[in-house]
Amino acid sequence: NQNQLTEIPVNYYENLLQLDLFLRKITSKEAGRKLEEAVKLILEARYIIFIGVGSSGALAEYGARYFTNIGLESYAISDPYQAVKGKGAPDVLSIVLSASGETDKIIERVVKLREEAPAKIISITNHPETTLSKLSNINLTYGFQTEYSAYDPLENLTSQLPVIAFIEILAHQAMEKADKCN
């Protein structure tokens, strides 16, 4: 029968199994509380700055576009040397994306933001015990197995699907909560 779906073997792409586990984990009470805290910061912000470099920079662009499309004023910074509008303002939220949580230019940017004022920072990283996660008000983590390119061993190929999931979940929860308040 041509209409039957074929099942993809688990060993076809290991990250599919990891994604399934991640999606189950984010429905837990603990994850729910963290997401609620993040949504509260999002709704308190005058505007949101997504920050990332490399693949995380592309996802920062996606996050800013997605949030803007639901009515949350957002900008993306994928160049670590770009100036930040209203930096250090207490009503500006930075959502910082970094799979490793250790990218030098990202850490430098976050340290500067924290020195200038009580910056509010949500980070999305692959692991919870990173420099970036420790500098953040809230850290959302996905815990995938780190994967590097055989072509260029310095290139991180860890799946970024959870980052997209976090961005979309946060946006939708913020939109729903804002609608209830209005």
Q: Model-predicted segments: where are they?
A:
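HTH-adjacent hinge/linker in prokaryotic transcriptional regulators
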Residues: N1-K34
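Short helix-loop capping/hinge segments that flank enzyme active sites or metal/cofactor-binding pockets
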Residues: L5, E176-N182
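Residues that form generic nucleotide/phosphate-binding pockets
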Residues: F22-I26, L41, Q173
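Glycine-rich phosphate/diphosphate-binding loops that line cofactor/substrate pockets in enzymes
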Residues: R33-A45
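Secondary-structure transition/capping residues
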Residues: K34, I49, C181-N182
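Glycine-rich phosphate-binding loops that contact phosphosugars or nucleotide phosphates
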Residues: L43-A178
